[in-house]
Amino acid sequence: MSTLHKVKAYFGMAPMDDYDDEYYDDVDAPAPRRAPVEDRRYPRRGERFADDAEYGYDEPGYRAGGPAGYADEDRFVSRHAPSREFDRPAPRLGSLRGSAPTRGALAMDPRRAAIFDEGSPLSKITTLRPKDYSEARTIGERFRDGTPVIMDLVSMDNADAKRVVDFAAGLAFALRGSFDKVATKVFLLSPADIDVSAEERRRIAESGFYSYQ
C-alpha cells in the first residue's frame, strides 16, 4: 500500500478494508493462554505421583500386608524409657541409724532429760511437798546429807508456808548453802558443794520438773 492510500484511509477517504497495515495484521489472532498460577506452582496429581513406583519399601523388618507394620518392633524401643529404679522410695534415715525410740518420762519432756544428765549437780535432786510445818524436819535432814532439795509448798496455807521458808533460809545460811525461789511457792535448797546456776533454775521452772517428783 502506498503512502498516499494510507493517508486517504486514515481520513476516511479510502475504505478500511484496503488498509492492511502490519500493525493490524494480528489483531484478530488469539492471544496465547497463560497457565493458571495453581498449574505452575503445583504439578498435576498424575505427574507428581508418576514416579512413585520407582521408590520401593524393601527395608528390613517391614511387613507390607501385616497389621502391625513392623515385624521386629523391639528394635524401635525408645532409649529414654523411664527406669523402674527411680520408683523405689528412699530409705528412711531412722532405719539406717538403728536407734530405738526413747521411752518413758524422759521421752515426754526433753527439757527434763537435760537436767538429769550424768554429772549434773541436779542428777540426785529430790522434791518434798510438806503438808504442814511439822514436815520441815525431813527437809533439813535431806539438805544436811548433801542432797539438793526442792520445796513445793503449793498445797500449804500461807502461814505454814512462810514458817517453812524461814526455816529453810536459816538452814541454808548455817550450812553455807543457797536458797533460791524457782516458782510461786516453790524453792530450791542447794548444799555448799553444789552450785546451781540461774540457767538451771530457769530450766527447772520452765519444765515443771518438781511436779514429776
Curated annotation (Swiss-Prot):
Please state the span of the N-terminal signal peptide per the UniProt entry.
none
Cell division as a keyword of this entry, yes or no, is yes
Q: Give a GO biological-process term.
A: division septum assembly
Q: Which InterPro entries match?
A: Cell_div_SepF, Cell_div_SepF/SepF-rel, SepF-like_sf
The UniProt entry, under Pfam families, shows:
SepF
Keyword rRNA-binding tagged: no
What segment(s) does the record annotate as region Disordered? 27-103
Kindly state the subunit structure of this protein: Homodimer. Interacts with FtsZ.
- Write out the function statement from the record: Cell division protein that is part of the divisome complex and is recruited early to the Z-ring. Probably stimulates Z-ring formation, perhaps through the cross-linking of FtsZ protofilaments. Its function overlaps with FtsA.
The family this protein is said to belong to: Belongs to the SepF family.
PANTHER family per record? CELL DIVISION PROTEIN SEPF
Its name, as the record gives it, is Cell division protein SepF
- Gene name, Swiss-Prot/TrEMBL: sepF
